[in-house]
């Protein structure tokens, strides 16, 4: 017994054998069996083993329950249409990436068109009010040449910083041990002619840390995939990239409706969204176009003070719909008799969209600016580019 007492598992095994053997005894040895059982129950080693066995059974049941939930929960959810995500981490990476060729640009348009990086907004100097909108980039995965010694090459617009950080990650994945090199970003010395997005912090010239020119075609492709709005394989020595201004795309990140926009409650009362409360049941729509009342359970991103750009859609019946450019609008296609969803800023004249009173209409579109409310958290915009198809995103 001394040996058994020094080895817990051996002692427990002996007790278990005694317990099983006691069950096989006749009633004439019941007293000795009971005394053995009492000594067994009093053994701390036995209690420990029973506790371990019970814990293992509980863990096994918990694992089975979790596995069951993982199978059942996806069946309980159904897809829903929501506002289009705006700025994010870039575009879906294609399976086969082809490098750009020298002098190629993507898109094949003028850099200053709205479909590319957009028009110039004005030079930003250190004493300009907009200078505070530039942000420094201290990403350790990016090398900055900073030949001026002023840190100017680290300054850029918020959107440019986002895309550059994504590109830096892609470069490390494509060529382990190689880092992204920024040779020029915001420029205050007017080295780029009279018109350049470098003066606004919206453009960068880039290369790889090893200066291997054979990589630059693929580097340009990675920049396109990272989400830069205009990429040019402008020279054998570097790649040029630029982005839209932060002001032109801010409405894609915040806002959905104005605080004055109203929601129809189940009671029949119209309530401004700025006064909407958790628990209110508002009119919404199912996937097949049926109106249902749904409970408001959460405001994940609500800002009643921030100014944003909105689109106003006017119908021939006099109705006005005010939403952000990336908001999805229910559009009716008479030719195919189908209901689709289109981003608000892509709706054209004579388009039919659904209104609550059953009327449909189409009309002009104009931009307005005021405060807005958004239903979704910013975190969703950080992951949307990796989970949504390109056609679903509002860039």
Curated annotation (Swiss-Prot):
Gene Ontology biological process terms, A to Z: Bolwig's organ morphogenesis; cell-cell signaling; cytoneme assembly; epithelial cell migration, open tracheal system; genital disc anterior/posterior pattern formation; germ cell migration; glial cell migration; gonadal mesoderm development
One GO MF term attached to the UniProt entry: calcium ion binding
Ligand binding (Ca(2+) 1): 147-148, 153, 183-184
Keyword vocabulary terms for this entry: Autocatalytic cleavage, Calcium, Cell membrane, Cytoplasm, Developmental protein, Hydrolase, Lipoprotein, Membrane, Metal-binding, Morphogen, Nucleus, Palmitate, Protease, Segmentation polarity protein, Signal, Transferase
Protein name per Swiss-Prot or TrEMBL: Protein hedgehog
Lipid linkage positions (Cholesterol glycine ester): 255
Site residues, Essential for auto-cleavage: 327
Lipidation (N-palmitoyl cysteine): 83
Nuclease keyword on record: no
Low complexity: bias regions: 26-43
Family annotation (Gene3D superfamilies): 3.30.1380.10, Hedgehog/Intein (Hint) domain
Localization terms from the record: Nucleus; Cytoplasm
Site (Involved in auto-cleavage): 324
Keyword set includes Membrane: yes
Assembly: Interacts with shf.
InterPro entries: Hedgehog (IPR001657), Hedgehog_Hint (IPR001767), Hedgehog_sig/DD-Pept_Zn-bd_sf (IPR009045), Hedgehog_Signaling (IPR050387), Hedgehog_signalling_dom (IPR000320), Hint_dom_N (IPR003587), Hint_dom_sf (IPR036844), Intein_N (IPR006141)
Signal sequence residues: 1-26
Major location (coarse): nucleus
Site, Involved in cholesterol transfer: residue positions: 301
Propeptide positions: 27-82
Sequence positions that bind Ca(2+) 2: 148, 184, 187, 189
């Amino acid at each position: 017994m001394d040996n058994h007492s020094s080895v817990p598992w051996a002692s427990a095994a002996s007790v278990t054998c005694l317990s099983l053997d006691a069950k096989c005894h006749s009633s004439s040895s019941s007293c000795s069996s009971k005394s053995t059982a009492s000594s067994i129950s009093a053994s701390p080693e036995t209690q420990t083993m029973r506790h371990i066995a019970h814990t293992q059974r509980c863990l096994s049941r918990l694992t089975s329950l979790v596995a069951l939930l993982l199978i059942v929960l996806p069946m309980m959810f159904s897809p829903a249409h929501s506002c289009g995500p705006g700025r994010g981490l870039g575009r879906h990476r294609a399976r086969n990436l082809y490098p750009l060729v020298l002098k190629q640009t993507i898109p094949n348009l003028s850099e200053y068109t709205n479909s590319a990086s957009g028009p110039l907004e004005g030079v930003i100097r250190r004493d300009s009010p907009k200078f505070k909108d530039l942000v420094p980039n201290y990403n350790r995965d990016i090398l900055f040449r900073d030949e001026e010694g002023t840190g100017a090459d680290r300054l850029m617009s918020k959107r440019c910083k986002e895309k550059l950080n994504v590109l830096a990650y892609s470069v490390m994945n494509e060529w382990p041990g190689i880092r992204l090199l920024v040779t020029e970003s915001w420029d205050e010395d007017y080295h780029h002619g009279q018109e350049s997005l470098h003066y606004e912090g919206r453009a960068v010239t880039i290369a790889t840390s090893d200066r291997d020119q054979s990589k630059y075609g693929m580097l340009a492709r990675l920049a396109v995939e990272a989400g830069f709005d205009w990429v040019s394989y402008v020279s054998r020595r570097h790649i040029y990239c630029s982005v839209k201004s932060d002001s032109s795309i801010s409405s894609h990140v915040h806002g959905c409706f104005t605080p004055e926009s109203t929601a129809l409650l189940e009671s029949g009362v119209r309530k401004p969204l700025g006064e909407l409360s958790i628990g209110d049941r508002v009119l919404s729509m199912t996937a097949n176009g049926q109106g249902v009342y749904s409970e408001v359970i959460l405001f994940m991103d609500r800002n009643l003070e921030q100014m944003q750009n909105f689109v106003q859609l006017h119908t021939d019946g006099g109705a006005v719909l005010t939403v952000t450019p990336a908001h999805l609008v229910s559009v009716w296609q008479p030719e195919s008799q189908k209901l689709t969803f289109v981003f608000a800023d892509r709706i054209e004249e004579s388009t039919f969209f659904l209104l609550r009173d059953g009327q449909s209409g189409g009309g002009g579109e104009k931009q307005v600016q005021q405060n807005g409310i958004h239903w979704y958290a910013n975190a969703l915009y950080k992951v949307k580019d990796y989970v949504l198809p390109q056609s679903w995103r509002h860039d």
